C-alpha cells in the first residue's frame, strides 16, 4: 500500500496538468474549447458532441473521470453552446463543421506537441468525426464512435419496429393506430418521423432516463449554466437541428464511409435505440480499417459515455490509449 502511495506521489510530482477554457479562431470565427487533463503528456482525446448542437463543455464534472488518462478537449461546434452565443448566424453545415474540426485537430497537435490525437464522436458527432477522419486521417491515431450512426434508412425502420412492438405490448391504442396508419416509415419525411419518434420516452432505456434526470439536476446546480448560457444552449440545438436536418435524413455511412484509414472502434450501449445498436453493428461489420473492435456495454443506452463511465474508460485505456502512445513513438 505504501509503495502504491509512493508511486502515486511520484506521478503527481512529475505530471503537468492543464486546465484551459477559451475561444480559438476556426473557420474564420471564434469557437469555444476547453482543454482539461491531469498531465499534458497524456494522449489528447477530442470529443465531437452530438445533438446536433448538444455542447458538452459545461459538464466538466461529468467528464472528469477521463482526465487522469487523457487530455480531454471539448469543442462547442458552430450552432452550439458558447460558440452559438458568440456567432448566432453561423450555420453548422456538416462540411463546414468538419473543416473546422480538422483545423482544431491541427491546432491541438501543434499546441500540445502531439504527432496525432484521438477523436471520439457521439451520435451526430460520430457522423462528423467520420468525415474528419476521412478528410485528414494523418491527424488521428484512432477513431472511436459511440451512439454510432450508420444507415439512416435502417435506423428509422429499426426504431419504428421497436416503437410499434412496445406500443402493442402496452396496449397503447393511440400510438398503434398512428403507426399502423403509416405502415412503412419514410426515412426522408422528417415530419412523419417526429410524429411517432417523439413519443418514445416511456420506452427509453433506464440508463438514458436517469441521465436526463441527472442532467436536469446539474443544470440547476452548475454555475456555468447561467440564464444566458442555458438559453443559448437550447436555442443552438434548435438552430442546429433545422440546419442539419437534410444531411441527417441522408446519412448512409455503410455506403459512403466503408473505408477508414485509421484504427476504428465502436463502444456502444447495448440498449441504444436513438442510434440502434443493431444498425451500428451492421455498419461496423462493413467497415474496412487497419484495425477495428466493437465493444458493447451492458445495460447502457445512447449515452454510455456518461452513464457507464468506468466501463467506457476501461475500454479506452485497454484498446485505444496504447495506439496514441505508439503514434508518438513512431517515426
Language-model features and meaning:
Residues 173-255, 262:
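Alpha/beta-hydrolase
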Residues 67-85:
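Conserved alpha/beta-hydrolase
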Residues 52-64:
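The serine-hydrolase catalytic nucleophile loop
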Residues 98-116:
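Conserved acidic catalytic loop of the alpha/beta-hydrolase fold
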Residues 300-313:
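Catalytic histidine-centered segment of alpha/beta-hydrolase-like enzymes
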Amino acid at each position: 500500500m505504501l509503495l502504491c502511495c509512493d508511486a502515486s506521489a511520484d506521478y503527481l510530482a512529475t505530471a503537468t496538468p492543464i486546465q484551459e477554457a477559451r475561444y480559438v479562431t476556426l473557420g474564420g470565427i471564434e469557437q469555444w474549447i476547453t482543454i482539461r487533463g491531469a498531465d499534458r503528456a497524456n494522449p489528447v482525446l477530442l470529443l465531437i458532441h452530438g445533438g446536433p448542437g448538444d455542447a458538452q463543455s459545461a459538464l466538466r464534472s461529468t467528464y472528469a473521470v477521463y482526465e487522469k488518462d487523457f487530455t480531454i478537449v471539448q469543442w462547442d461546434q458552430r450552432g452550439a453552446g458558447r460558440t452559438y452565443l458568440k456567432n448566432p448566424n453561423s450555420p453548422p453545415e456538416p462540411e463546414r463543421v468538419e473543416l473546422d474540426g480538422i483545423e482544431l485537430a491541427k491546432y491541438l497537435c501543434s499546441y500540445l506537441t502531439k504527432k496525432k490525437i484521438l477523436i471520439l464522436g457521439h451520435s451526430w458527432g460520430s457522423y462528423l468525426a467520420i468525415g474528419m477522419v476521412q478528410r485528414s486521417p494523418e491527424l488521428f491515431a484512432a477513431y472511436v464512435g459511440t451512439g454510432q450512426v450508420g444507415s439512416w434508412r435502417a435506423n428509422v425502420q429499426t426504431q419504428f419496429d421497436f416503437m410499434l412492438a412496445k406500443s402493442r405490448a402496452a396496449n397503447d391504442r393511440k400510438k398503434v393506430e398512428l403507426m399502423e396508419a403509416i405502415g412503412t416509415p419514410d426515412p426522408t419525411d422528417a415530419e412523419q418521423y417526429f410524429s411517432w419518434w417523439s413519443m418514445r420516452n416511456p420506452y427509453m432505456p433506464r440508463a438514458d432516463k436517469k441521465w436526463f434526470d441527472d442532467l436536469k439536476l446539474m443544470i440547476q446546480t452548475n454555475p456555468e449554466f447561467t440564464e444566458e448560457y442555458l438559453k443559448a444552449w437550447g436555442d443552438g440545438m434548435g438552430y442546429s437541428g433545422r440546419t442539419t436536418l437534410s444531411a441527417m435524413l441522408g446519412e448512409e455511412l455503410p455506403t459512403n464511409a466503408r473505408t477508414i484509414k485509421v484504427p476504428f472502434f465502436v463502444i456502444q450501449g447495448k440498449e441504444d435505440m436513438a442510434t440502434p445498436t443493431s444498425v451500428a453493428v451492421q455498419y461496423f461489420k462493413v467497415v474496412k480499417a487497419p484495425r477495428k473492435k466493437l465493444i458493447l456495454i451492458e445495460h447502457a443506452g445512447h449515452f454510455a459515455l456518461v452513464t457507464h463511465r468506468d466501463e467506457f474508460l476501461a475500454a479506452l485505456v485497454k484498446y485505444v490509449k496504447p495506439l496514441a502512445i505508439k503514434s508518438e513513438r513512431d517515426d
